[in-house]
C-alpha cells in the first residue's frame, strides 16, 4: 500500500520523467548511492518528491543551511499535505559552547538560548518517526548530532486507555519521569496541571492542543482533546499515545544505571589525576561532577547533561552515538537519505567532528569534563556516509566523491519543464567593469527585471552599492553578518521591487529562486579560488536561468581553467536544451512564482490593533483582538515564519499591558 500521497497540478516534464525512472529503479535495486545532476530550475525538488512517493520509504532530506531547509519544508508540505512532513534543525537561537583556553586560564561557560518553536518541531519529528512510516523529515546538519536512545524513548512513552486502572498519584509521577513539569499557573508545552481528578497535559510536540484525562477513583473515565487557544473540546478518544517531553528522557531504571556508570567513571578519572599529581584538575572534576550527580538524582537533569549522554544511552566508549538516523531506522526500517546541494553539504558534514573533538579534548584534559563527554559528538564522516540506508545526492555540480560513490547510478536533469535555457554568457574586460555594468543595469531595470552582482570582498560590495545608489539606482548588499531572517527579508524586498540590484559575496550561489533576475554579473571572474572555482561559477551563473532573458556577464582579464570548464558545461547544457525545445516546439517562458500573500500586506489583525487607540479600547474588545493575534501567531510559527510570529508576539504583549 502506498505510504505517500503526492499532490501536484502538473505531471513530470522535461528531464524529470527519465530521472525519476532511473533513480527509482536504482533505489529499488538496493544500490547504496545514487546522484541526481540537475541544473538550476529543472525541478529537482519535484523529482525528489516523486522518488520518495515511488520508493515508498520514510525519507530524510538534508541541507547545509536553515534557509534552504525552510524552503524545502514549505515545498514538501505542499507536495504531501496528507503526510507527516517534519522539520529538524538546531533549536538554538544562540549557542556558545563551554570551552577552556589554557594559556589564559580562561573557562567559558556554556551559554545558549533555545527557540521553543524549533524545539517543538524537533520533538514532533522524532515522535512521528516512532509512531508512523509516512514521514519526511527536512533537516540541517543537526541530524548528525547526538540524541537519546530511541528504544529508551519508546519505553518511556505511555498509551492511555479509557477504562484502564491507574493510580492517580503514580500517573502524575509517571508524567514527571517523562519530562513533564507540573505548573498550575502557566500551562504550556511540556507541562501538566492537576485539579481534583482531572489532569491536563500539554504535549511537548504540539502547541495547538492539550489532552484532558479524567479519573474516577483509580480508573480513567474520559480522554478528550482540547484546543489550546479556544479551550473548547475538539474530540473524545478511547485511547491516546503520550510521548516524552524530551528526546533524552529515560525511565527510572536507566536513570539509576546512568548515575552508577557516571560514578564509576568519575572514580577512575580521579584516580588518574591523583596518580599524575594533578590536584587542581582532581578537585575541579570532583566538585563539578558530584554537583551534577546530585542534580540528576534529585531532578533527572542537570546543566550540561548532554555531556553524560553516553551513560544515559548505554553506548560503549567511542561507539557511534545515537542520532536522528536511528529514529528513522527504528525496528530495522528501511529509509532514504537525500542530501540536497551535496557539493556543499557533504564537505560541511565532514568538518564537524574535528572541531567538536578539539574543544572537548581540552575540557577533559584539564578536569572540566569526564572523558565520556567526548562521546557526545556529531557523526564522523565515515559513520555518516556508511549508515545502513540508501543515499541520493542532489546537485547541479556534484563533487568527485558523489560521482565515485554512485558509479553508474547517476541521472541527469538538464531539460527544464519551462523550456528555459542555461543563460547566455559573455566575458568582458575588467578594467572598466563598474561603468560597463552600470550601462547594462539601466537596460535591465528599464524592463522591470532585477540584477545580481557577486564580488570578491565585502568592501567592494559596499562601495559598489554606494556608487550605484549615488547614480540613482536602487541597490542593496548582503554579507555573512546578516542573519537568516534579514537575508530572507532582503530577498523578498528584491522580488517586491523595493530595490533592483542585490550585491553579495558568497551568498548568491545556492538556493536563490528568483525568476525576476535576468542579469548576473561576476566581478573579477579570473581570480582563481573558492569563490571563482568551476563549481562556484556554474552555481552563480545558474541564478540567471529562471528568466527567459537570462544573461551572465563575467568581468576578467583572462579566461581561467575554471572559467573554461564552466563555459563548456553551460554550453553543452544549453545546446541540449535548445535541441529539445526545437524538437518539441517549446518556447522558453520565465518562471512565474507567486509572492506569498503575507509579504505584500501586514496581517489585518496587526493593522487594526495599531490603528485603534488601545488604551481606550473596551477590555472585551481587546481580549478578542489578543485571541485573534494569538491564533495568527501560532499559524505563522507552524509555517516557520518566525519573523512575523515575533512581531505578533510583541503586539500581544503590548496589548496585555494595557
UniProtKB/Swiss-Prot annotation:
In what residue span(s) does the Helicase ATP-binding domain sit?
25-414
Q: Which residues bind ATP?
A: 38-45
Q: Which residues form the Helicase C-terminal domain?
A: 433-607
Annotated ranges, domain UVR: 623-658
GO molecular function terms listed in the Swiss-Prot or TrEMBL record: ATP binding; ATP hydrolysis activity; DNA binding; excinuclease ABC activity
The effect annotated for residue 501 to V is: In strain: 84-183
- Reproduce the free-text note on domains from the UniProt record: The beta-hairpin motif is involved in DNA binding.
User: Family per UniProt?
Assistant: Belongs to the UvrB family.
Q: What is annotated about its quaternary structure and interactions?
A: Forms a heterotetramer with UvrA during the search for lesions. Interacts with UvrC in an incision complex.
PANTHER family membership:
UVRABC SYSTEM PROTEIN B (PTHR24029:SF0)
> Which HAMAP family does this chain map to?
UvrB
User: What is its biological role?
Assistant: The UvrABC repair system catalyzes the recognition and processing of DNA lesions. A damage recognition complex composed of 2 UvrA and 2 UvrB subunits scans DNA for abnormalities. Upon binding of the UvrA(2)B(2) complex to a putative damaged site, the DNA wraps around one UvrB monomer. DNA wrap is dependent on ATP binding by UvrB and probably causes local melting of the DNA helix, facilitating insertion of UvrB beta-hairpin between the DNA strands. Then UvrB probes one DNA strand for the presence of a lesion.
Q: What is this protein called?
A: UvrABC system protein B
Organism in which the protein naturally occurs: Helicobacter pylori (strain ATCC 700392 / 26695)
Query: What is the taxonomic lineage of the source species?
Result: Bacteria, Pseudomonadati, Campylobacterota, Epsilonproteobacteria, Campylobacterales
Amino acid at each position: 500500500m502506498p505510504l505517500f500521497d503526492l499532490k501536484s497540478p502538473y505531471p513530470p516534464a522535461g528531464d524529470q520523467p527519465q530521472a525519476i525512472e532511473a533513480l527509482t529503479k536504482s533505489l529499488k535495486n538496493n544500490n547504496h548511492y545514487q546522484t541526481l545532476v540537475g541544473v538550476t530550475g529543472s525541478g529537482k525538488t519535484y523529482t525528489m518528491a516523486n522518488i520518495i512517493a515511488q520508493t515508498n520509504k520514510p525519507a530524510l532530506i538534508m541541507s547545509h543551511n536553515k534557509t534552504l531547509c525552510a524552503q524545502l519544508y514549505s515545498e514538501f508540505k505542499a507536495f504531501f499535505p496528507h503526510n507527516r512532513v517534519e522539520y529538524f534543525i538546531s533549536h538554538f537561537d544562540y549557542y556558545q559552547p563551554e570551552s577552556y583556553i589554557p594559556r589564559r586560564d580562561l573557562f567559558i561557560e556554556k551559554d545558549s538560548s533555545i527557540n521553543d518553536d524549533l524545539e517543538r518541531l524537533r520533538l514532533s519529528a522524532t515522535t512521528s518517526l516512532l509512531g508512523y512510516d509516512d514521514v519526511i523529515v527536512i533537516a540541517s546538519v543537526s541530524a548528525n548530532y547526538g540524541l537519546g536512545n530511541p528504544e529508551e524513548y519508546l519505553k518511556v512513552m505511555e498509551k492511555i486507555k479509557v477504562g484502564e486502572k491507574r493510580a492517580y498519584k503514580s500517573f502524575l509521577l509517571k508524567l514527571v519521569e517523562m519530562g513533564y513539569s507540573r505548573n498550575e499557573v502557566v500551562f504550556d508545552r511540556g507541562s501538566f496541571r492537576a485539579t481534583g481528578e482531572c489532569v491536563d497535559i500539554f504535549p511537548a510536540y504540539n502547541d495547538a492542543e492539550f489532552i484532558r484525562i479524567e479519573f474516577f477513583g483509580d480508573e480513567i473515565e474520559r480522554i478528550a482533546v482540547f484546543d489550546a487557544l479556544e479551550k473548547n473540546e475538539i474530540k473524545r478518544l478511547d485511547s491516546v499515545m503520550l510521548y516524552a517531553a524530551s528526546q533524552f528522557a529515560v525511565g527510572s531504571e536507566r536513570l539509576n544505571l546512568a548515575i552508577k556508570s557516571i560514578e564509576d567513571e568519575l572514580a577512575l578519572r580521579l584516580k588518574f589525576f591523583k596518580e599524575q599529581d594533578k590536584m587542581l584538575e582532581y578537585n575541579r572534576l570532583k566538585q563539578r561532577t558530584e554537583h551534577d550527580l546530585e542534580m540528576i538524582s534529585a531532578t533527572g537533569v542537570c546543566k550540561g547533561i548532554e555531556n553524560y549522554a553516553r551513560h544515559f544511552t548505554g553506548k560503549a566508549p567511542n561507539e557511534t552515538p545515537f542520532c536522528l538516523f536511528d529514529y528513522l531506522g527504528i525496528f530495522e526500517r528501511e529509509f532514504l537519505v537525500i542530501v540536497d546541494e551535496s557539493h556543499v553539504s557533504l564537505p560541511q558534514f565532514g568538518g564537524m567532528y574535528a572541531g567538536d573533538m578539539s574543544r572537548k579534548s581540552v575540557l577533559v584534559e584539564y578536569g572540566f569534563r569526564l572523558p565520556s563527554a567526548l562521546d557526545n559528538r556529531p557523526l564522523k564522516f565515515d559513520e555518516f556516509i556508511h549508515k545502513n540506508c540508501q543515499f541520493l545526492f542532489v546537485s547541479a555540480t556534484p563533487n568527485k566523491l558523489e560521482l565515485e560513490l554512485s558509479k553508474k547510478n547517476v541521472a541527469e536533469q538538464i531539460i527544464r519543464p519551462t523550456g528555459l535555457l542555461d543563460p547566455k554568457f559573455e566575458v568582458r574586460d575588467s578594467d572598466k567593469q563598474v561603468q560597463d555594468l552600470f550601462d547594462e543595469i539601466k537596460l535591465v531595470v528599464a524592463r522591470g527585471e532585477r540584477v545580481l552582482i557577486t564580488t570578491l570582498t565585502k568592501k567592494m560590495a559596499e562601495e559598489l552599492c554606494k556608487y550605484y545608489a549615488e547614480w540613482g539606482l536602487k541597490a542593496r548588499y548582503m554579507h555573512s553578518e546578516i542573519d537568516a531572517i534579514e537575508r530572507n527579508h532582503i530577498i523578498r524586498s528584491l522580488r517586491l521591487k523595493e530595490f533592483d540590484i542585490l550585491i553579495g559575496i558568497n551568498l548568491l550561489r545556492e538556493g536563490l529562486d528568483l525568476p525576476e533576475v535576468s542579469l548576473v554579473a561576476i566581478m573579477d571572474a579570473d581570480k582563481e579560488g573558492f569563490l571563482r572555482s568551476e563549481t562556484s561559477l556554474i552555481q552563480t551563473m545558474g541564478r540567471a536561468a529562471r528568466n527567459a532573458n537570462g544573461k551572465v556577464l563575467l568581468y576578467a582579464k583572462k579566461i581561467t581553467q575554471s572559467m573554461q570548464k564552466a563555459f563548456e558545461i553551460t554550453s553543452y547544457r544549453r545546446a541540449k536544451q535548445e535541441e529539445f525545445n526545437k524538437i518539441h516546439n517549446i518556447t522558453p517562458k520565465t518562471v512565474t512564482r507567486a509572492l506569498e500573500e503575507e509579504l505584500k500586506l501586514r496581517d489585518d489583525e496587526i493593522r487594526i490593533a495599531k490603528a485603534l487607540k488601545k488604551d481606550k479600547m473596551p477590555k472585551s474588545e481587546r481580549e478578542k483582538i489578543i485571541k485573534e493575534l494569538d491564533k495568527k501567531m501560532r499559524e505563522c510559527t507552524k509555517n516557520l515564519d518566525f519573523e512575523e510570529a515575533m512581531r505578533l508576539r510583541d503586539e500581544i504583549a503590548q496589548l496585555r499591558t494595557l
